[in-house]
Amino acid sequence: MKIFCKILPEQEIREKLKSIEHVDFSLFVESLPQTNEDLSELNVLVLIEPNGYFGHSDWAIKNKDLFSLIITWDQRVLNNCPNAVFLGFGHTWFKPEQYTKKHDKKFQISHLCGALLKTYGQSLRHEILARENEITSIPKKFFPTYGDRHNIEEARIGKEEVFGDSQYGIAIENFSHKGYFSEKILDCFL
């Protein structure tokens, strides 16, 4: 059993799959094989992010025969890979103890811009941040960023600070794709 994952701790996945560790398979979650040694008898690819970030969907279509199964929401992959199955994607980074606790909500609006500026949605978030002073009818908390987005625990705490005490939040996705949304939508419901 080989685990390659960029979004979850590989050790945590390995522990959950311990009962099938004897099976010769490789699991690639938002990660691609780098060498033939990464591949096994059974190979599963899970695509999460839109192709516009890393080009993984394009790569998967070209290399579909390497995989026993491709799990994705991406319609192009589903149309071009007979070994692909649909799994709608939407998630939150928050843990149950964060989204089940009572937050003291105030009449205000929160907005988290983020540091990246690669997509149309990201440019819209930057535009809203730049025009923050035009919003005068409601109290607001606007944040250019929230800390280290590569540290999931710090990101969870930062996003709770951004959205935890506001009745309203502005959520703009990076991309618009059928079958996909990211944590940005759910963050506002904290």
Question: What residue ranges belong to the model's regions?
Answer:
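Nucleotide-sugar donor-binding catalytic core of glycosyltransferases
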Residues: 1-190
